[in-house]
């Protein structure tokens, strides 16, 4: 439905106007691309932060959703979402308590770690509650914000895998449009490098005796391309839902 000039003039500002039909087409296009590549899709909800859109994504075939913080995960759980990855290292006792309170309400909760200290705090909390928490180790593939450097990933993975109360099932990264350490507009090159770096991390961790399953990567600019490399098992794009010219 298109708004007339008269209807637009009557809107209170600031306001957000969403083309739901276009959003649904974007959801379906990204899902189709992931399916064609044989890669799971776990969209990030930080763009919309609305359970109604997250449910659309899951109904279209998404494996689950990704959140940036505990409060987003709480909102999504209240809205009926049951498979949630909080893709930011869980630091601070109050955040951990809230995350652990979510676990019984969900079919699957995945938490993030990127250091021994972060994992130790999670391990202690899980043991105190009698829980076994699924975790993923974040790999720094060039963004330089969070994550363990590639060369230290295997050693840290071994230590985390030995911690009681934790089950290390995978690795993840957020790289965005970075190639050889610098910003780029070439999403194909960025995606190829991202896939290769994550495949290398996975190989080194498995060679160290840690049997991870999930290798998760991809942003909206690189999501389709990194899925098509065949080097990752899951992609987590987010902004694609409202970017009507991206796909």
What is each residue range found by the language model?
Residues 1-18:
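Generic N-terminal amphipathic, Lys/Arg-enriched alpha-helix
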Residues 1-3, 22-53, 66-68:
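N-terminal glycine-rich anion-binding loops that anchor highly charged ligand groups
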Residues 18, 114, 237:
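A conserved hydrophobic position in a structured secondary element of the catalytic/binding core
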Residues 18-21, 110, 189, 193:
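Short, surface-exposed alpha-helical recognition segments that flank or form part
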Residues 21-29, 193, 197-200:
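A non-catalytic, amphipathic alpha-helix used as a structural packing/dimerization or gating element
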Residues 28-31, 100, 123, 203:
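Generic structural signal for well-ordered alpha-helical scaffold segments
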Residues 44-180:
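Active-site-proximal beta-alpha core segment in soluble small-molecule metabolic enzymes
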Residues 134, 141-247:
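Active-site loop/helix belt of alpha/beta enzymes
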